[in-house]
Amino acid sequence: MTLQIGVIGCGAIGQDHVRRMYQTLSGARVVAVTDIDAQQVREVMARHGPDIEAFDSGPALIAAPQVQAVLVTSWGPTHEELVLAAIAQGKPVFCEKPLAVTAAGCLRIVQAEMAHGQRLVQVGFMRPYDAGYRALRQVIASGQIGAPLMVHCAHRNPCVADGYTTGMAITDTLIHELDVLRWLLDDEYASAQVVYPKRTRHALPHLADPQIVLLETVGGIRIDVEVFVNCRYGYDIQCEVVGETGIARMPDPAAVPLKSAAMYSIPILTDWKQRFMAAYDVELQAFIDGVRGQRLTGPSAWDAHAAAVAADACVLAQSSGAVERMAAAPRPAFYQS
């Protein structure tokens, strides 16, 4: 069975997902698209053929009988309504982050999905599908470094757009670490604090950059995450786990070391698309396979809710300067697998 997918949102990430379904993935095809920008819809249809039907709205696309599953890649504040509509129709839905713009919105989706009685939602957190993170998790699970005690992370971008704000360092950038570290350590967060080093001269006047986020898990693991979004030199994601008997560091992406002109160098990537392109392929293939096999296993609505709760605490800590406590709710049995 070829899964028939409708895509809501034909911007950069939506078009990229359509491309990978045609060029890279198997078991699915795009049968419907919609976007508030009609030109973007026309571009998708021109590039990928006349068999794709255009719809005037997301709800109309979701209700269409030929659409068996939905991809939500539209503007973030529209996500909650669209995901709830897909659940109401009993249709599996892959939703790019954010699942909802508030933790309360994520919880409403959790409740709707549980009331439906079957997992329908996969959230677009791609890092658990990255080969480097997976290798690091295998080392932790093997016991080779003993119990994790500390984690040192960095999330560095060369630059950001003018509209990027201090809060977005949490809600747009750190949110990926907040998700993947729960998965990596199999632990929940207990507290968060944000401290500000000397400010880079490359940051816009309204932006505090860099920032250091200090997290503690329920199990007592201490985590520090450097968020530096104007580092200039490249896109650089680092993660090192310090255990009782050893240290494990996530490998950098494979690149050809170069010796030339009396220098030894290794190239560094410049954007997130390059760094996680393979992970995007794997996560979307996992969604397709999960729908066809009637068992979704990727990042869930509950994972999105947990990340949103942690993000709220971090945003509060940005302004308070204090250690902000989090009450980690237990994962519902519905999401334990």
UniProtKB/Swiss-Prot annotation:
Keyword rRNA-binding found: no
Top EC class for this record: oxidoreductase
EC number(s) per entry: 1.1.1.18
Keyword vocabulary terms for this entry: NAD, Oxidoreductase
Keyword tRNA processing: no
GO molecular function, one term: nucleotide binding
InterPro entries for the chain: Gfo-Idh-MocA_inositol_DH, Gfo/Idh/MocA-like_OxRdtase_C, Gfo/Idh/MocA-like_OxRdtase_N, MI/DCI_dehydrogenase, NAD(P)-bd_dom_sf
Reaction equations catalysed: myo-inositol + NAD(+) = scyllo-inosose + NADH + H(+)
GO biological process, one term: inositol catabolic process
Pfam family, one: GFO_IDH_MocA_C
Family, as annotated: Belongs to the Gfo/Idh/MocA family.
Function in brief: Involved in the oxidation of myo-inositol (MI) to 2-keto-myo-inositol (2KMI or 2-inosose).
Subunit structure: Homotetramer.
Protein name: Inositol 2-dehydrogenase
Gene it is expressed from: iolG
